[in-house]
Amino acid sequence: MNDKLQTTNYKLKIAWLYPELMSTYGDRGNIIVLQKIAEDNGIEAEIVRINQTSNSELLTSCNLIFMGGAQDLQQEIVNKDLLENKGSILKKMIDEETPGLYICGAFQFLGNYYKDAYGTKIKGLGVFDMYTESYKNKPRLIGNCVISPTKPYREAASTAYTLNAKPFLVGFENHGGRTFLSDKSQAFATVEKGYGNNGEDKTEGIHYKNSIGTYLHGPILPSNPELAVYLLQLAYEKK
């Protein structure tokens, strides 16, 4: 895969969920890259900013979804809005294979639950079959990360960068929560360097239908533009 999309000219709507609250570690750079690559390929890309006051139906008009990470307070605000308002629509779109990229806290929201270091359990949307827990006696997982994506992404990914003859992606992780997948075969990638979902089982992220959840900041798409191409191609094919 290169930076060229196999498309004809068309319009694309990219949903940016909670841009004021969920954009830590430069995650807005992912939106910039998606829009730039789309426009370089003759695609008119409209960024649709979705926040707490947005009509939930606005989300359904979009072809691609992005949500970044946040600090704990901002995550509480967003999680409340998702559970009470937009979550059912988001879940339906993901289940119906609308492509999406969900970073760190956004990735955690889509699991079954998040348990903080004090034992408080926060309900998730239950889109991804996984859970996340934080522990008082365990450190945050911080540092550069190198991952080898698993199928189905690997077959479509660029082979321009290799590590031990495997395609790989790079990014930066910084998370206190440790995520455990019910089915490890759904992992987005295998960790080559760093911690990944939990620092134990070498899984990183999740690949569910056309959605990718990951702990990789960087931001991830400027560091790995072939992933942006992959998501945009999925959006075109789904449209």
Show where each model-derived region lies.
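Conserved beta-strand scaffold positions in the cores of enzyme catalytic domains, especially
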Residues: 16, 47-49, 127, 171-173, ...
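Cysteine-nucleophile active-site neighborhood
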Residues: 72-149
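Glycine-rich beta-alpha junction loops
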Residues: 18-20, 176-178, 218-220
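N-terminal beta1-alpha1 cap of cysteine-dependent amidohydrolase-like domains
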Residues: 1-92, 155-163, 222-239
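Pocket-forming structural segment of enzyme catalytic cores
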Residues: 118-204
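Short coil/turn connectors at secondary-structure junctions
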Residues: 62, 97-98, 122-123, 169, ...
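A glycine-centered loop/beta-turn motif at secondary-structure junctions
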Residues: 198-236
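Structural motif
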Residues: 64-68, 101, 215
